[in-house]
């Protein structure tokens, strides 16, 4: 697999999702990543540390330049816990849990987050403002309500299917209520 192509596709998709979601500085962005799927394999079966590092480092650079915080979801072997910066865990009141990811428990994305973040910790649960799912890892449990599907500019990174989620406030009040316009809500 061509690493330059994977990096280019990752950059294109992330920048497109950020444009479509209009995330603000300080927002939480969750990443689900199967390096196995990126390489054309079955999720969890052919994990690649190199691919995890390439993708996470690329995304951290893009998000960091915008002041957006990355949370990297692990697999079910770590109960889908997430790696974030300690400062983010403290700022958002997230519960820190004790686990250190491995290639086959947590995955390559989490290992990469531990490598590239300043002070990484694992947290049990978050409510991110938006997220990117590379390889059908199921990030929905970590994106706040109401979740809105985003169609990225590319449908795949490498061989992995790509989807994204944004969120918007719940609409309450009924027939007489009026709602502000936003870029996420479909009218």
From Swiss-Prot:
Provide the protein name: UPF0340 protein SPJ_0612
**Entries under HAMAP family matching the protein:** UPF0340
Lineage top rank: taxon? Bacteria
Q: Check the record and name the SUPFAM superfamilies matching this protein.
A: TTHA0583/YokD-like (SSF110710)
Which InterPro entries does the UniProt record give? Antibiotic_NAT-like, DUF436
Q: Which family does it belong to?
A: Belongs to the UPF0340 family.
Q: Which organism is it from?
A: Streptococcus pneumoniae (strain JJA)
């Amino acid at each position: 697999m061509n690493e330059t192509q994977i990096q280019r596709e990752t950059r294109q998709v992330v920048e497109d999702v950020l444009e479509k979601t209009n995330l603000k500085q300080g927002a939480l962005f969750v990443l689900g990543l199967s390096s196995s799927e990126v390489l054309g394999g079955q999720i969890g079966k052919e994990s690649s540390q190199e691919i995890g590092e390439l993708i996470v480092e690329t995304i951290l650079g893009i998000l960091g330049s915008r002041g957006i915080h990355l949370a990297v979801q692990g697999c079910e072997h770590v109960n889908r816990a997430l790696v974030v910066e300690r400062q983010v865990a403290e700022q958002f009141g997230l519960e820190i849990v004790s686990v250190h990811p491995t290639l086959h428990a947590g995955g390559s994305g989490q290992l990469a987050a531990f490598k590239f973040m300043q002070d990484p910790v694992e947290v049990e649960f978050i409510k991110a403002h938006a997220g990117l799912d590379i390889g059908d890892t199921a990030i929905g449990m970590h994106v706040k309500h109401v979740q809105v599907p985003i169609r990225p500019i590319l449908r795949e990174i490498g061989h992995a299917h790509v989807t994204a989620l944004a969120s918007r406030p719940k609409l309450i009040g009924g027939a007489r209520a009026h709602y502000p316009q936003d870029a996420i809500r479909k009218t």
